[in-house]
Regions:
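Amphipathic, well-packed alpha-helical segments that form the structural scaffold of globular domains
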Residues: 13, 17, 37-40, 44-45, ...
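Short coil-to-beta transition motif at edge beta-strands of beta-rich domains
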Residues: 31-58
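Short, surface-exposed secondary-structure edge patches
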Residues: 27-33, 63-64
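A generic structural motif
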Residues: 20-29, 153-158
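Single conserved hydrophobic/aromatic residue that forms the stacking wall/gate
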Residues: 1-10
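C-terminal accessory regions
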Residues: 56, 60-64, 68-186
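A structural micro-motif recognizing beta-strand termini
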Residues: 28, 42-44, 113, 128-129
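Short, structured beta-strand/loop micro-motifs enriched in basic residues and often containing a Trp
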Residues: 15-25, 52-56, 101-106
Length: 186
């Protein structure tokens, strides 16, 4: 997974999953989904039905719920039924109606923020200047700890040192403390 500069990495998809006459495609807005593309669920959907099948096609498990950050591969695009079949990494198969495709995005590359809670065999981290509030030690730690076996940083060594030295954290103004106080007053 490429964790930063995801727009640039997605453009390079043509090398990872090039178009061909035998691969169905579905255009949604500015995005073209193609059989074989890696995709990510971008919001929780507790109603979405999934099933697991044996290698012989027999369903042996069913359930509901696909969650933000789940990744998979497009197995089929069917224009007759207006559905796209995605096989998630844990072998859950999900049929998305074409009206639900806004819940997916291409996942050849993802941002560090979207990678939180997930692991990948290898992580490529482009190291280039960015906003100071993002160039901090916590974000660098998050990026590095997403990798199971291999981390490769590409770019400017100064950016690595800047992030490692920057201990600042962006203060969040969520009003959570006020909401908790309101609940205590009930």
């Amino acid at each position: 997974a490429c964790l930063v500069g995801s727009e640039m990495c997605i453009r390079d998809r043509q090398y990872l999953n090039p178009p061909s006459a035998d691969k169905m495609e579905k255009e949604v807005g500015d995005t073209i989904y193609r059989v074989g593309d890696k995709v990510m669920q971008i919001k929780n959907n507790y109603q979405l039905e999934w099933e697991r099948k044996s290698r012989y096609g027999v369903t042996y498990d069913r359930g509901n719920g696909i969650f933000n950050g789940d990744t998979g591969v497009i197995e089929d695009i069917n224009f007759f039924s207006e559905q796209m079949l995605v096989r998630f990494e844990d072998d859950r198969f999900v049929y998305y109606d074409f009206t639900q495709l806004d819940e997916l995005e291409l996942a050849y590359a993802i941002t560090i923020h979207k990678s939180q809670g997930s692991e990948y065999p290898a992580v490529l981290i482009p190291m280039f200047p960015g906003p100071r509030m993002l160039m901090n030690r916590n974000l660098l730690y998050t990026a590095v700890t997403r990798a199971r076996t291999c981390v490769c940083m590409v770019g400017l060594e100064d950016c690595f040192h800047e992030m490692a030295a920057n201990e600042s954290e962006q203060k969040r103004y969520s009003s959570l403390d006020l909401r908790i106080q309101e609940m205590d007053n009930l």
